Amino acid sequence: MKERFLVTGGARLEGTVHVSGAKNSVLKLMAAALLAEGTTTLTNCPKILDVPYMVRVLEGLGCSVVHSGSTVEITTPAEISSNADFDAVRQFRASVCVLGPLTSRCGKAVVALPGGDAIGSRPLDMHQSGLEKLGAKTHIEHGAVVAQADQLRGANIHLDFPSVGATENILTAAVLAEGTTVLDNAAREPEILDLCVMLKEMGADIEGEGTSTITIRGVEKLHPTQHEVIGDRIVAGTWAYAAAMTQGDITVGGIAPRNLHLALEKLKVAGAEVTTYDHGFRVRMDRRPMAVDYQTLPFPGFPTDLQPMAIGISTVADGVSVITENIFEARFRFVDELVRLGADATVDGHHVVMRGVEKLSSTPVWSSDIRAGAGLVLAALCADGVTEVNDVFHIDRGYPNFVEDLQRLGAQIERVQV
């Protein structure tokens, strides 16, 4: 049964919220458990829909998975299937991260082309070319990417773009390859670093993690481990922008502020008071935000996943903002929904010009992806009246306890069945 959120605008959000493990990390760590026979335990896992989806994928490959609260235990047998179940994989984009581990462990991988958010083209070209340089043969057939290799061998690999997914699949393939792999122009996102930390805990030989050049010396075997998932910087950033948009005061825990440095700096420019701690931060805003320009870039640039929040705050800011999207070409789809709420926006290619308005007005809107959905809820908090936010299953894929956390912060929001 479909659900929607009813959001009453006008509340000033105040209080403390703690973020759980990162969606963009936990799914890749679960896939990495395929690399070692035995039981790998992940803690601080978020309560989001994509985790059970990944559990289905792993169970379809032959793993035994126990998911209890924020802990996931994955027992990988000596022999696993190389064929990832189509019905499970097509549910979400991150499922493609089993490609590297399966090619490495089984010598073959058949992974259905993934589903996920409608935010633009995200081809697997770099995933395939990376595996091919390691010695695999790859092709697309019957709606799946197929990779085969008798023995992967280390290679020098340069990525044309620092793709997060390609970096992850090359890492998980190279750790058991024969010889040394040097990956140049690798993604530097904190979630990549988290994956490298876990792989090293499993016995991988990796240097340069967190930089644009990663060196992987293949080992014969990895062993299972226990690992705590890093905090979700995108969820944390969402709360930061919620505080600024509602002229509120929110303290966020469970996150390293350095992973959100630029996003928090932008809030300072907009007029917010930002205080950072070892494992969190506080954002306080007592005025209408000032207009700020944004452009999304790979880490350490402004995250594309926070672009909807940047557009959201620009909607109600004092002045004109230009937001440039450099990662995904279709991520401005939700701007039409903001216009329905009264936003003054002009989209021109991969730029959107936002002329801030003092107040938005309620109307039904529809979420098109995880982050756009969250951005619409934040905009609804700034609107007069009650806004219906539809297709909220998108939000549930990436935000644990979203409604409950908002209610604790003072928002008037309820989940209703349609």
Curated annotation (Swiss-Prot):
CDD domains on file: UdpNAET
Entry EC no(s): 2.5.1.7
Superkingdom of the source species: Bacteria
Keywords: Cell cycle, Cell division, Cell shape, Cell wall biogenesis/degradation, Cytoplasm, Peptidoglycan synthesis, Transferase
Predominant localisation class: cytoplasm
Reaction catalysis annotation: phosphoenolpyruvate + UDP-N-acetyl-alpha-D-glucosamine = UDP-N-acetyl-3-O-(1-carboxyvinyl)-alpha-D-glucosamine + phosphate
Listed GO CC annotations: cytoplasm
Stated name of the protein: UDP-N-acetylglucosamine 1-carboxyvinyltransferase
Species: Corynebacterium diphtheriae (strain ATCC 700971 / NCTC 13129 / Biotype gravis)
